[in-house]
Swiss-Prot record:
It comes from Aquifex pyrophilus. It catalyses: ATP + H2O + 4 H(+)(in) = ADP + phosphate + 5 H(+)(out). This is ATP synthase subunit beta. It is found in: Cell inner membrane. Gene3D superfamilies: 2.40.10.170, Bovine Mitochondrial F1-atpase, Atp Synthase Beta Chain, Chain D, domain 3, P-loop containing nucleotide triphosphate hydrolases. PANTHER family: ATP SYNTHASE, ATP SYNTHASE SUBUNIT BETA, MITOCHONDRIAL.
Length: 478
C-alpha cells in the first residue's frame, strides 16, 4: 500500500488554504485532492467534526500548495494535518447513486444513510476521443410543443435556456426532467450550481411525489456554499452521468441550473488566487473553464449525454462575456423573454430568438421543417406589423395582413402549454404533446381552418383537439 503523504496548514484566507508539505519528493499535482478534519460548532453550540476536501490550485514555492476548499473553512487552524489523496477527488458512480442527493465531493447529503457504491471515478476525466464519438443524429422528443417544433433537441446535444431572473428557466427544466423520466424512462442527473437551496429542496420533494426520483441523481452546490463548491459541482455530476453512458450504455440527461453560476464561481476563485481579471471582471481562463465542462457532454457509440443548461443572462445583456462564452458550445438556444412572461404565455420561449442547428430538412424531415418555417414567418410578419398597429390601428392594415395578425395571435397563444410541475400553481393538468401531434396541430392552424375559434381557446392547451374542446366550453361555434 502506498505511503500516505501528509502536510500541514500554514494559512487560511476565506476559502483558500495554503498547505506545506515538508520533506516530500513530489508535491501534489494541480487538481489533485487533499482532505482534513474540520472541527466547528453547530447551531446548537455543540462541537462536531467533518471531513473537508480541498483541491490543489497553485504551487506557490517553499514546498507549499494553495488549495481551494470544497466546503466551509471555519474551524481550520494553522498547523493542522492535511492528507494528500494521491489523485483527484473520487466520486461514487453506478446505480447505487440513483434517487440520492450528493455534494461536490460525492458525499450523500439527504440523510438516507451511506451509499454502497462499487466504483469510484475521479471528478476530472478527459472527454471521449473523436473516434469514440457518435455521428448519428437522433431527435429527442420533449413533449413541449414550442421546443419540439421550433428548436428540436438531439441526443447528445447541448441546449441553453437563456433568460433573466424570474422568467421560468427552472420550471422549464423541472418539466423536462419530469417528461424524460416519465415518458422515456431515462436517467437524469440534476446539477444545482449556485442556485437557491429552497428550489433544490422543492425539486427533490416534487420528484419524490411524482415517482421520478428513482431515475434521478442530484448533485448540489448551492448559492450559500463557497466558490470552490460551485465551481466544481458540474464536474461531479458529469462523472456520474459518464458512468451511465460509458458502462451502462444509457442515454442520459444532465440538467445544469445554472451554468452562469459556474462561471461566476470561477471568477471568484480566480480573484482569490490573485489572477488579473479580463473583460467585465471575469477570469482570464473563462473559455478554458467553460470548455472543460462542455467538451465532456457528447454522444459516444455506447450512449449519450444530453445537456440542458439554464443560463442566467446578467441584466438581460446577451453580449456579456459569460453567456457569450457558453453560446459557442450550444446546438440549440432556448431564449425566454420577459415580454412573453408579462403576457402570461408560458413557457415564455421566444419563437423567433430561439434556434437549433438541427431544424433542417435532413434532420427533422420536410413536413416538420416547412411547418416550423411557416410558423416563424407568420410570427415575424406579426412582429413587423405591431409597430404599424400601435401607431395607426388594425383598420389601416390590408385584409391579408389582418388575417396574418389574427392567425399569429392564435399561434402565439397555442405555443403556450400547461406543465405537470406547475399544476399546483395553475390549477390546470399538465400536457405532454407528441411530436407528430404538434406538427399536425400547427399544420391545421396554419391552413386557417380554425381562424374562427376565439383566441383564448388556443391558450394553455395541448393539441388542436384540446383547443376545439376549450372553444366548445367557451360557447363558441366550432
Amino acid at each position: 500500500m502506498a505511503e500516505v503523504i501528509k502536510g500541514r496548514i500554514v494559512q487560511v484566507i476565506g476559502p483558500v488554504v495554503d498547505v506545506e508539505f515538508e520533506g516530500v519528493k513530489e508535491l501534489p499535482r494541480i487538481k489533485d485532492g487533499l482532505k482534513t478534519i474540520r472541527r466547528a460548532i453547530d447551531d446548537r453550540g455543540n462541537w462536531f467534526e467533518e471531513v473537508l476536501f480541498m483541491e490543489v490550485a497553485q504551487h506557490i514555492g517553499e514546498h507549499r500548495v494553495r488549495a481551494i476548499a470544497m466546503g466551509p473553512t471555519d474551524g481550520l487552524v494553522r498547523g493542522q494535518e492535511v492528507e494528500y489523496l494521491g489523485g483527484p477527488i473520487k466520486i461514487p458512480v453506478g446505480k447505487e447513486v440513483l434517487g440520492r442527493i450528493f455534494n461536490v465531493a460525492g458525499q450523500p447529503i439527504d440523510e438516507q444513510g451511506p451509499v454502497e457504491a462499487k466504483e469510484y471515478w475521479p471528478m476530472f476525466r478527459n472527454p471521449p476521443e473523436l473516434v469514440e464519438q457518435s455521428t448519428k443524429v437522433e431527435i429527442l422528443e420533449t413533449g413541449i410543443k414550442v421546443i419540439d417544433l421550433l428548436q428540436p433537441i438531439i441526443k447528445g446535444g447541448k441546449v441553453g435556456l437563456f433568460g433573466g431572473a424570474g422568467v421560468g428557466k427552472t420550471v422549464l427544466m423541472q418539466e423536462l426532467i419530469h417528461n424524460i423520466a416519465r415518458f422515456h424512462e431515462g436517467y437524469s442527473v440534476v446539477v444545482g450550481v449556485g442556485e437557491r437551496t429552497r428550489e433544490g429542496n422543492d425539486l427533490w420533494l416534487e420528484m419524490k411525489e411524482s415517482g421520478v426520483l428513482p431515475y434521478t441523481v442530484m448533485v448540489y452546490g448551492q448559492m450559500n456554499e463557497p466558490p470552490g463548491v460551485r465551481f466544481r459541482v458540474a464536474h461531479t455530476g458529469l462523472t456520474m452521468a459518464e458512468y451511465f453512458r460509458d458502462v451502462e450504455g444509457q442515454d442520459v440527461l444532465i440538467f445544469i441550473d445554472n451554468i452562469f453560476r459556474f462561471v461566476q464561481a470561477g471568477s471568484e476563485v480566480s480573484t482569490l488566487l490573485g489572477r488579473l481579471p479580463s473583460a467585465v471582471g471575469y477570469q482570464p481562463t473563462l473559455n478554458t473553464d467553460v470548455g472543460e465542462v462542455q467538451e465532456r457532454i457528447t454522444s459516444t457509440k455506447k450512449g449519450s449525454i444530453t445537456a440542458i443548461q439554464a443560463v442566467y443572462v446578467p441584466a438581460d445583456d446577451i453580449t456579456d462575456p459569460a453567456p457569450w462564452s457558453i453560446f459557442a458550445h450550444l446546438d440549440a438556444t432556448t431564449v425566454l423573454t420577459r415580454r412573453l412572461a408579462e403576457l402570461g404565455i408560458y413557457p415564455a420561449i421566444d419563437p423567433l430568438e430561439s434556434t437549433s442547428k438541427y431544424l433542417a430538412p435532413e434532420y427533422v424531415g420536410e413536413e416538420h421543417y416547412e411547418v416550423a418555417m411557416e410558423v416563424k414567418r407568420i410570427l415575424q410578419r406579426y412582429k413587423e406589423l405591431q409597430e404599424i398597429i400601435a401607431i395607426l390601428g388594425m383598420e389601416e392594415l390590408s385584409e391579408e395582413d389582418k388575417a396574418i395578425v389574427n392567425r399569429a395571435r392564435r399561434i402565439q397563444k397555442f405555443l403556450s402549454q400547461p406543465f405537470h410541475v406547475a399544476e399546483q400553481f395553475t390549477g390546470m393538468p399538465g400536457k405532454y404533446v407528441k411530436l407528430e401531434d404538434t406538427i399536425r396541430s400547427f399544420k391545421e392552424v396554419l391552413t386557417g381552418k380554425y381562424d374562427h375559434l376565439p383566441e383564448n381557446a388556443f391558450y394553455m392547451v395541448g393539441t388542436i383537439e384540446d383547443a376545439i374542446e376549450k372553444a366548445k366550453q367557451m360557447g363558441a361555434k366550432v
